[in-house]
Amino acid sequence: MKKAFVKSYGCQMNVYDAARMVDLLGREGFAETEAMEEADVVILNTCHIREKAAEKVYSELGRVRDLKGERAGAGRETTIVVAGCVAQAEGREIIHRAPAVDVVVGPQSYHRLPELLARARDGKVVDTEFPLDDKFDHLPPRRVAGPSAFLTVQEGCDKFCAFCVVPYTRGAEVSRPVAKILAEAERLAAGGARELTLIGQNVNAFHGEGPDGRPWSLGRLMRRLAEVPGIARLRYTTSHPRDMDDDLIAAHRDCPAVMPYLHLPVQSGSDRILAAMNRRHDADTYRRLIDRIRAARPDIALTSDFIVGFPGETDADHAETMRLVAEIGFSGAFSFKYSPRPGTPAAESADAVPEAVKRERLAALQALIDGQARAFNLASLGRTVEVLIEKPGRHPGQVAGKSPYLQAVQIEAEPAVIGTILPVRLTRAGSNSLFGERAEAAPAAAA
């Protein structure tokens, strides 16, 4: 049997896309392998959001090239595929830089992967089109790999933030029809999924056509998904503050299946930098939005994204970001040094912040956020929460899962409980996860 190896970089959407590529190849007789040296097809599903992520791909391609040569010496062929957002952004340039690559395919074209592999027998293939047909109509039924599953409901972004390549690599905002989302959710639930995470580049801009022929909001979609038998938990990511509407906030208040967790990137606390980023909101608008969300769901855990060292950022701008973080209090965040992405407006700025200053600001911000994350976890100790058990734990006799607040939790239990939701009393905080013991029942969340 032919084998395929897939390595995915970056966001949850890439994780989802990688799984769908495996499904596609499975229909063609391929088995997935975790050992690259065994693979007849090697796929790197790439991320272009930061320069470091893109350069990692070329470094990995050097290793794959060497592997391809070794296998050729043993009489075995290897087809190398670069997929994802680097493929979309750089196209044929990838083959110029890495001639061992056979196929370059963008995120809107990977449903044609079997066809592209067949064409690659006759030469290099590049497909970075934005086809008019819906790629989801060409994908095979999902495989369920555990009690938690990603479900794509929206793709693309129309916001055009000055630092971001997503509108160029993923295209304009497109929402899937509600009927197709529900059908996929029902298949996932029938396969054992208990939790669905709805994903999209700008997921709360969802406006898919409902059965009534009218666009549905994300809040309405989540209420309907909560009615799917077997689905106990719903999450969504990633959101933009401008699309966080009253209906979605109300879903956090009124729909028990919607978990008390929200990832809502703000990027900066400085109005001047937010304007330069083309975020189309200011810091106080974000603060007021958080107040409304917390009024609806007081126990909600909030995480965010931050960029430090954006062109023109001053010490005063950075201080505003630190002030916003201190005032709001996050359970975690992703923070990065700004890196210019080719083709974006910010990449043309001459007002670069020195690398040493970026490093210093990033260290200060991460120290503040790490302290808040530790405080959030420590405040959870002694509480009883419902944990979705997802997989075996780090050590024999342990299982691991997630709290409603997306905290990793380890408990002592037999593997038979995987896929169930258990009440767990949290007893200890480690560096990356919480530890607990089974309890009688979890109390109701704060209202």
From Swiss-Prot:
Top class in the EC scheme: transferase
Name of the encoding gene: miaB
Predominant place of localization: cytoplasm
- Give its localization: Cytoplasm
All copies of the TRAM domain together span 378-440
Q: What is its EC number?
A: 2.8.4.3
Origin species, per record, is Methylobacterium sp. (strain 4-46)
Annotated ranges, domain Radical SAM core: 143-375
Q: Which family does it belong to?
A: Belongs to the methylthiotransferase family. MiaB subfamily.
Q: What is this protein called?
A: tRNA-2-methylthio-N(6)-dimethylallyladenosine synthase
Annotated TM spans: none
Task: Describe the location of the MTTase N-terminal domain by residue ranges.
Answer: 2-122
